[in-house]
Amino acid sequence: MQLFQNLLVSTTRPWALVRGQNTARLLIVALDANHNVLVNEIENDIFRLIKQLAPGDDIENANVEVTHADVRYKQKKSLYKVTSTLTGPIAIEDVIYFNPPGGIPNTVDTSKDIIFRRIRFGRTEVFAQSEALLATQVQNKKVQAKKGKLRMVESQPSDSQEASSGDMKVDHRYVRSGLTNGMISGLLLFSIHSKRTTSAGRLVKTVIIGLGAGLLPMCMRNYIPTLKIEVVESDPVVLNVAKEYFSFEEADGLKVHITDAMKFVKERAEGNNSSKIDVLIIEVDSSDSSSGLICPEAEFVEEPFLLAAKDSLSDKGLLIVKFITCYPGVRAAVYSNFEKVFSNLFCLHADKGFNELIFALKKDSPFIGEEELAQACEALQRSLEHNSGDWVKQALVDSKKIKQLRKS
């Protein structure tokens, strides 16, 4: 119900939700918490009402979708709430779905209730959240990466018996977000295209702006051990939450900097070649809804930052930006900013909505067209032919969805 309260008191969020669902009209139905009406009866009433309100006579063939805000949860438990002076309200909760989402690792017993842990940021509660799978503790199986190859590994389950909820940890093998899958796919695809290889002592230097729950860097470390990951997070409260509730751990090859992201990127841009970044990922939510952006902060898609980001990249560097907006005008303006700085631009639409990833290569030439992308997809498939994990299949599917960025 809190979600509905936040939605209804806002002057912009309902319209943003309408645009985000790519629909012309939105009907919000708020039910008393003590109601005992069956879901199918509610839907029947909604359809009868829509028939009376809808324009035209072809309502039977209209595309009407009903989304339930709370009915999908069998159980929801609040674990922790904190208000940060930098980030605002942060809430952690465990949920059990009536119908769990797909992609659950086959080592998880799906005949029992599956618990998911979520982080919610108050400033973007309607739109954004990170969600992780809780499972018995798993151990990583270390595989030596061969010279010149991007070697992937998957963690294996431990031999421990069923654990209580207190013994459960976040399973970083599980990827719920289509955007996370897309980032991994794009990183692998353009690494293959640029013929970036790794050898002893040469890791792919990766910087992620924005920690959140820490799921992206932990997932990338598990699946792509050839990355040397640095995370830039401005809020120490967010780091503490990620460690305490989402099993985030710093280790060799994964370090967090509590500092200003703009300052960090500018210093890398002005530094020598040894400090340059191979892959720069921007994954931060907007704190100002009036900008028309849900992700990222407006300054991260403005020309001054994009110029600094380009200068911070190595010769074969790649910039990945998580980009979410409900407004076509804002999208066009952001595209225009990118086109002023980069020539090789690509995008991937994820999660069947207005979520998008923008990929920008530092090198302006040679120009990469659809034919070159198709060849890179084939090369990626060959490089992963000995990996049988579900995430590999998804990476290959997503890589084929990456297209040249166009305004129209």
Language model segments and positions:
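Short, solvent-exposed loop/turn elements at domain surfaces
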Residues: 100-102, 126-130, 368
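Short beta-strand element of the conserved SAM-dependent methyltransferase core
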Residues: 10, 119, 358-360
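A short, structured beta-strand/loop element
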Residues: 118-134
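Residues in well-ordered beta-strands of folded domains
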Residues: 93, 120, 184
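The AdoMet/dcAdoMet-binding core of the Class I SAM-like
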Residues: 3-81, 85-88, 96, 108-110, ...
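A residue-level signal for beta-strand positions that form part of recognition/binding surfaces
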Residues: 89, 116-118, 357
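Class I S-adenosyl-L-methionine
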Residues: 94, 325-408
